[in-house]
């Protein structure tokens, strides 16, 4: 058992965020954490990685277990390049290598010093555990998988875009290989190819993975369990996201039936009390019913999901059918051509997806369409 939560609660002032949370994490688990915005997912993650203490109950961690947490926001040393940043994942092994060199020199002068040989053994254990003599191979594998080609490895972290920095933080965390890997929306800023690589990597991960994500396809591919945060507590479901849906529906039906039965029982008890409390012959029986009513706990009905809002705006003039017209649109950055001689018309009612690997110009195209960047050739006109 890596983590065990027992009747855990967490509040901020008078605002209760989590209550009666009981759950466990074992090595090999891949747990998807889902719930509406504001239900306490990030708060739970901070408790799980030890950054925040519970106000009630207990969070117990396996002795010596390491935890790595990828937040949605984070920082890198802006002066270190991409490759140097990745080498930081091996810092314990790099320190052990430096110490090992010193110890070997000491041992050469004092062959029978068991204290030195013990330290050498400890250093080698750290190096072997991280497979540090193959660190360059590992670094290159993860960088390539996370869409950092070799020509980016010498770039300073400070000049990377926000999305690239997030990918680099994730790449470094994967190399650190903590026992408990906690990821908050890891698929943000990933293209489809990188997502496929990450899914494969996580499915083979030897530790436990806990991930907050709104991407049901990612949850289906990676997760073996689902934690649903609803009503300030966790309900655990076996299987991936698709397996969770019918389980939750069945659980909600059971809860609703129990809630309705409890409400009906309470109403009958109250009705009996109202009719019989003032009658001398039935007062004792009515008082007994009152005690039953006081002890009766009404099962909480399942919380309905928030309904999607639909807006419809009236207009006096019928809008154009052709909303965006592109003719010979060309986009270049420096000597690199991102788009060349595109002819395309976006019609009213179209719903488009712009897909492509990172760095192919998706965001740049949107900036051109929005008028924030001038095209290198051709034209864009709004209808």
PLM features: what roles do these ranges have?
Residues 1-259, 307-383:
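ABC ATP-binding cassette signature C-motif
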Residues 247-296, 300-302:
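Intracellular alpha-helical coupling/juxtamembrane segments of multi-pass membrane proteins
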